[in-house]
């Protein structure tokens, strides 16, 4: 079984990831032949974006199964708990990571025997990856209906093919609209401190021939005031039961500005990102990353030695600021606490 997309390649023996830390200057790849190597790749942001992290973890689980394999099924299940724990401890905010690992573990236990288990787990990981692509295309189709011909969309971070197995969530909506023949322009904010907008979104859209303009983060409000923005579309790392959205740091700021200027603020996310067990955004753990991501840029120090740094990787946007949540099952509007539940009742 093999899979190859812009973000990842599964050869059957290893997981090869495009190194997103190096884009756009260099296109390099990192080969992961063990579950611990996959864990390091997730932790170090070789791969990032909630759906891409989830799929990578699923393939990491497969590699771990091969490393931990023993003939006794119960002993094997026990050893796989360690694999799951190592992979789960990489990034705390993205719920797709835990969703994918729980699905892999449930599949293992449901299969219930040692014969053929490695092949079965590989097939399940492939299913997770392939389903993600189809889900993203469905999100794109639903979301494209919200965009008019000639619209300019502001994006934050990267919720494109690079953040998923392929096609993307927020950028998937833009791709789908363009495929429908609509003329869509994109303003991509740079997304400090990791510059996913400048490095990844701009690179990805230019590869697709989609009209993209790069702005710094502090230009988004003025761009809105000048009437240059018709809609905002972002992805999500976790959506709480009440509609609060955890996403890349700076998302909350963009949402507040959109509200102030009467611009619709859309969140594009698969149902696997919706966590009904998390009541509100206050219950979402927010990862904090190393201070050098703020004090350095492009490998060069830009701040004084010893300065204190606060570097949360994510923030939480209140549900009241979200116009709608675009999923593979349709577009969800407020009240979110009621309507998000309906997605899982169908």
UniProtKB/Swiss-Prot annotation:
Enzyme kind, highest EC tier: isomerase
Highest taxon of source: Bacteria
Single GO molecular function: S-methyl-5-thioribose-1-phosphate isomerase activity
GO biological process: L-methionine salvage from methylthioadenosine
EC number in record: 5.3.1.23
Annotated site residues (Transition state stabilizer) in this chain: 157
Annotated catalysed reactions: 5-(methylsulfanyl)-alpha-D-ribose 1-phosphate = 5-(methylsulfanyl)-D-ribulose 1-phosphate
Keyword field: Amino-acid biosynthesis, Isomerase, Methionine biosynthesis
Transmembrane regions listed in the UniProt entry: none
Positions of substrate binding: 48-50, 91, 196, 247-248
Pathway membership: Amino-acid biosynthesis; L-methionine biosynthesis via salvage pathway; L-methionine from S-methyl-5-thio-alpha-D-ribose 1-phosphate: step 1/6
Active site: 237 (proton donor)
Entries under InterPro entries matching the protein: IF-2B-related (IPR000649), IF-M1Pi (IPR005251), IF_2B-like_C (IPR042529), Initiation_fac_2B_a/b/d (IPR011559), M1Pi_N (IPR027363), NagB/RpiA_transferase-like (IPR037171)
Family note: Belongs to the eIF-2B alpha/beta/delta subunits family. MtnA subfamily.
Role noted for this protein: Catalyzes the interconversion of methylthioribose-1-phosphate (MTR-1-P) into methylthioribulose-1-phosphate (MTRu-1-P).
NCBIfam families in alphabetical order: eIF-2B_rel (TIGR00524), PRK05720.1 (NF004326), salvage_mtnA (TIGR00512)
Stated name of the protein: Methylthioribose-1-phosphate isomerase
Source species of the chain: Thermosipho africanus (strain TCF52B)
């Amino acid at each position: 079984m093999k899979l190859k997309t812009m973000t990842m390649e599964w050869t059957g023996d290893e997981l090869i990831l495009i190194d997103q830390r190096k884009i756009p200057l260099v296109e390099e790849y990192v080969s992961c032949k063990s579950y611990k190597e996959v864990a390091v790749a997730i932790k170090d942001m070789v791969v990032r974006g909630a759906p891409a992290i989830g799929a990578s973890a699923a393939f990491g689980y497969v590699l771990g199964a091969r490393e931990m394999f023993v003939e006794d099924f119960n002993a094997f299940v026990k050893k796989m708990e360690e694999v799951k724990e190592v992979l789960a401890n990489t990034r705390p905010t993205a719920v797709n990571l835990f969703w994918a690992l729980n699905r892999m573990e449930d599949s293992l236990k449901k299969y219930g025997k040692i014969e053929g288990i490695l092949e079965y787990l590989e097939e399940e990981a492939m299913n997770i990856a392939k389903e993600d692509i189809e889900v993203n295309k469905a999100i794109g189709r639903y979301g494209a209906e919200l965009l008019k011909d000639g619209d300019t969309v502001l994006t934050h971070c990267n919720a494109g093919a690079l953040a998923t197995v392929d096609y993307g969530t927020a950028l998937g909506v833009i791709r789908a609209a363009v495929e429908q023949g609509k003329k869509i322009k994109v303003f991509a904010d740079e997304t400090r401190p990791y510059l996913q907008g400048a490095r990844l979104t701009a690179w990805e859209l230019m590869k697709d021939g989609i009209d993209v303009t790069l702005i710094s983060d502090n230009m988004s409000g003025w761009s809105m005031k000048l009437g240059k923005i018709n809609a905002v579309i972002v992805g999500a790392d976790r959506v709480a039961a009440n509609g609060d959205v955890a996403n890349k740091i700076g998302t909350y700021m963009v949402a507040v500005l959109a509200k102030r200027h009467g611009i619709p603020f859309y969140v594009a996310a698969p149902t696997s990102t919706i966590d009904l067990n998390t009541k509100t955004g206050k219950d979402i753990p927010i990862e904090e990353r190393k201070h050098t991501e703020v004090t350095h840029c492009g490998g060069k120090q830009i701040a004084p030695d010893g300065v204190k740094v606060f570097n949360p990787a994510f923030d939480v946007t209140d549900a009241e600021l979200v116009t709608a949540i675009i999923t593979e099952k349709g577009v969800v509007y407020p009240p979110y606490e009621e309507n998000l539940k309906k997605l899982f009742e169908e």
